[in-house]
Amino acid sequence: MSMKTKAAFHLVLFGLACWALISYFEASEGIASFFGTKSGGMVFDLNLTPFILFVAASAVYLYLQKKSRPARKQLLLPDEFEEQDEREQMMTAKACRASYIAVYFSLPAAAVLLIFYPLFQSRIPFFPIIIVFIIMIIQHLSYVISFKKNEKNSGAL
């Protein structure tokens, strides 16, 4: 599987995981009261669509991953650390540095945004979940973009 395909899958999985967590967050109060009552008479609504889509997308990703990579390192390391030679190790090191710098600047920005969270908590109660996933997406995109840029500069085909 190419790096662009993996990155696209990762972004889709991040989005679906964020949607699933938001759905759970919206239903969490009903779930807590459901388990808190002895009769179990309370009913809660939980949107299962994001969970089903996340499981389906994960299954497709794992199938394609298993097909393209040997079983020796199935889930131990992220896909980004499958260097074949020193050139790829150097590209990975530069991309990790770029990713670190992106997170270094995005975390304080997220902290500033979270300062204002009480002002709109009633309208967007799941805002911290969105912030966490935005940081993950920024980190991943900065890694992939830097890796591709370094790949072009290194003379790779």
Swiss-Prot record:
Keywords: Cell membrane, Lipoprotein, Membrane, Palmitate, Signal, Transmembrane, Transmembrane helix. It is found in: Cell membrane. A lipid is attached at residue 18 (S-diacylglycerol cysteine). It comes from the Bacteria. GO terms for cellular component: plasma membrane. A lipid is attached at residue 18 (N-palmitoyl cysteine). The chain crosses the membrane at residues 42-64, 98-120, 124-146. Residues 1-17 form the signal peptide. The keyword Lipoprotein applies. It is a multi-pass membrane protein. This is Uncharacterized lipoprotein YgaO. It comes from Bacillus subtilis (strain 168).
